[in-house]
Every structure is written in C-alpha cells, then in structure tokens.
Amino acid sequence: MNFTRTRRLSFGVGLISLLSGSPLLADEELSLSFLDKNDFYLSSAGFKVQLANGPKGEKALHALPPHRFVIHTANGVSRYLFADPKRCICIFVGSKDNYLSYRSILSQPLGAAPNDVEADYKTNALTMLNAPMGGKDIYDPDSLSEFLQDYY
C-alpha cells in the first residue's frame, strides 16, 4: 500500500513538472548556427532586412518578441516581422507570400547531414514553423510603423 501511494505521488510530481516546464520549452533559444542559416532562409524567401540602428530601431526591435514571427498591420497593409536581436540586430520584413516561401524552404527535407550539422537543427526548424503571432500582441505598434514606414 505504501508503494502505491509513493508511486502516485511520484506520478503527480512528474506530471506537474512536465506541465509547468512545457511553456519553457516553447521559449527555448535557437542555436546560433541555426540563426545564421535562418537569416539566409529569410533573405532567400524575399524578406527585407531593416537594421535596428538608432533609437527608433532599438525601440522597434525591443517591441517584438525575439526570433518569432509577428503579423503587423498598418494602413490596411499586413507585414510579417521577424526580430533577430542576436545575429544581425535587425528586423526582417516581408509579405504573406514571403512568409509562405520561407515556410516552404524550411519544410524541405535536408537529405543526409554532414557531421558538423547540429543535432538540434530539426527541432529549431520545427520551432520556426509555428504560426506567427498577431499584431495585437505587440506592446507599441505605432513605434513599429514609424520605424518600418518604408514597407507600408
């Protein structure tokens, strides 16, 4: 009887740990080598690079979640934004077509990987295939419009 009680307690603690740790997995940082490749994929898909130099750029970069797609709409025009505060310190700006092209590039099978390719590449790629966030999640959307006015 004591064994059964201990087993239930262990299961309960394990389940709570698993459920409370799940949000942390979603925020797992992407590897630097994946981010290098990802910048190339974004550019190949037609995303334009807007360097976040200067006060407006820094404000816009910090208003976006790092390494996540966000759909931002201003003046009836929607743009897909991807902030990269680690590698290029920039925001990639593109259309829905650019985003779909990017997803197509990322979804293609890699084939045989050389030994120097990180084992977590597939996990990183799957993370990037998550649905983009809506613009309503951005803290101060006007700061983005001001910085990215060339794209609207």
Predicted features and spans:
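N-terminal secretory signal peptides
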Residues: 26-75
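Bacterial N-terminal signal peptides
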Residues: 10-21
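C-terminal partner/receptor-binding element of secreted or periplasmic proteins
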Residues: 33, 97-152
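Bacterial N-terminal signal peptides that target proteins for export
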Residues: 2-12
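Mid-chain, structured segments of secreted extracytoplasmic proteins
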Residues: 67-111
